[in-house]
Amino acid sequence: MLSRMPGPGPIALVGSGEFLPVMAEVDAGLLASSGRSRPRVAILPTASWPDGETVFRRWAAMGAEHFSALGAEVEPVLVLDRLDADDEAHAQAIGEADLVYLSGGKPGHLTESLLGTRVGAAIVAAHERGAALVGCSAGAMILAARHFDFRMRRLLWPLRWQDSLDLIPAVTVIPHYDAWPEALSAMFVLQAPRHFVTLGIDEDTAAVGRDGSWQVQGAGRVTVWHGRRRERFRRGEVFRL
């Protein structure tokens, strides 16, 4: 379990499974790291907005139910797009949270909604003051330095890379890693920005890190690519970035 300590808070990169029982142990540990009896949680379902309002609101409701059951005070922050992300009230909600959760969907939409906005700045500031940040799938991708994006393209190659929030410098993330053929994942890795580390995070699995030390939690493995060199880590194992 991570304990409350000065400086930047923990970051959890989740391959899939947000708000499901399989992630309850991981999320409970992150809540405990706040040191509060009733931590405040902000849920950002922004990445799912392109999938429609029904999906967007379902993720918000699932997040509220999941974290309420873990003893948290939960506020879904209903940021649809970039305009909403410049709303001071939304930024304030992030600023008051002990844990900020970015759920899955479309990473390109999430990036374009948050970068250079009040909410984006509030997420970074929350991390720096000690709040836990959790990103699942698309959310995990944008907590890193850069991410790939497939949208509106007939050809996947070469990959198009976008800047992310850069809370984990020189790192890119492939979520749902065990759902991809690894030969395809290797092609992603080979096109990653020069000198970047790529983290492949299996479904129902998290890499939880602080101060450069990362532990694997959940059901699967984390695959760490340094260029063409690959290492795998299982539940409970630790690696450094």
Q: How would you name each of these model-derived features?
A:
Residues 42, 48-105, 109:
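Portal/gating segments that form or line small-molecule/metal binding sites
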Residues 8, 36-41, 97, 130:
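A general structural motif
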Residues 13, 75-76, 101-102, 133-136, ...:
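General beta-strand structural signal in soluble alpha/beta enzymes
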Residues 17-21, 76-81, 109-113, 175-177:
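Short, flexible loop segments at the rims of nucleotide/cofactor-binding pockets, characterized by
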Residues 103, 111-179:
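Class I SAM-dependent methyltransferase SAM-binding "motif I" and its flanking Rossmann-like core
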Residues 2-38, 47-61, 65-68, 147-241:
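C-terminal and late-domain segments of enzyme folds
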